[in-house]
Regions:
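Hydrophobic, well-ordered beta-alpha structural blocks that scaffold small-molecule cofactor pockets
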Residues: 1-115
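S-adenosylmethionine/decaboxylated-SAM
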Residues: 88-93, 103-107, 111-281
């Protein structure tokens, strides 16, 4: 076994721990924040960088995506005397677990002739919407977003409940025109711009086969789940983002409440932001 220290005890690090192959044995996390030392993340102890290297691990994996930060962390590890291999999870920029799962679900939906449109709530600049549009070239895709960032009423709930540090206007660096240019089949897209659920009225008679819910915050996620779930075809899927992450815990709260009410068991996806699948029986 290759004993490994994961440097960076955050959301990314927790997912890297789950993605490590069977040849690797994670001994601990290392982190520069003293407040995390002596705690556990994903059941793995968190130590200072100095303490993490004392057992002489075989390798260190840097749990950050930012290249500048990764360079700083690598220099720190070398300065502490570690001479072994240092891994950078750059492949995760190329291979996307959530997109792969969505494509597999789309293939299954086509094979089983599950009827319904596609949709995404929380479009931002359209990267994932473009993937869905490509996977369902002959189906309508409904796209819901304020296209102006987080609205004040939703952010207020986040702050009052301590769900996140969201700010009004976050993720506002977008526009419908930007998204349209990214879609491979823009003629199949129907845009619903504004604050959800007020923008859902035109879809009350719609049926869905696959819906991506990526609203980040508690209130819009809680509002979206029953509206889309009740309109899913049998075998249809909700793919919900940020459920098992640490940046936006309100989305996870909304999903857990909804699943308890409906008697559902969410199926986790091993992507970087803790997505889950909810499938209609």
């Amino acid at each position: 076994m290759i004993t490994t220290v994961l440097f960076g005890a955050g959301q990314f690090g927790a997912m890297i721990a789950r993605l490590m192959g069977t040849d690797y044995a994670v001994s601990c996390f290392a982190d520069n924040y003293e407040g995390k030392w002596g705690t556990r993340l994903a059941g793995i102890p968190v130590l200072s960088p100095e303490e993490s290297l004392k057992p002489a691990p075989d390798c260190v994996c840097l749990c950050v995506m930012d290249e500048e930060r990764a360079g700083q962390m690598e220099a720190q590890i070398r300065k502490l005397g570690f001479e072994g291999p240092i891994l950078r999870p750059n492949a995760l920029k190329t291979f996307d677990a959530r997109a792969a799962v969505m494509r597999l679900l789309a293939e299954q939906i086509h094979e089983e002739n599950i009827p319904g449109a596609a949709a995404e709530f929380g479009v931002f600049r359209g990267d994932f919407a473009a993937c869905i549009n490509a996977a369902f070239p002959d189906r309508t895709i409904h796209l819901f977003d304020t296209f102006a960032g987080f609205p004040e009423e939703d952010v207020k709930i986040e702050r009052e409940q301590g769900f996140s540090r969201a700010r009004v206007g976050d993720f506002g660096e977008t526009a419908q025109e930007i998204v349209e240019k990214r879609l491979p089949h823009p003629e199949k897209a129907v845009f619903h711009a504004g604050v959800f659920p007020g923008t859902f009225s035109d879809c009350r008679e719609e049926t869905f086969a696959l819906v991506s819910v990526d609203a980040d915050l508690y209130a819009p996620t809680a509002a979206a789940l029953p509206l889309f779930w009740d309109r899913l075809s049998p075998g249809g899927v909700l793919l919900v983002h940020d459920v098992n992450g640490t940046q936006f815990v309100g989305a996870g709260r909304a999903v857990r409440e909804f699943c308890r009410e409906k008697g559902l068991l969410p199926m986790p996806v091993c992507d970087l932001h803790g997505s889950v699948i909810l499938r209609r029986p």
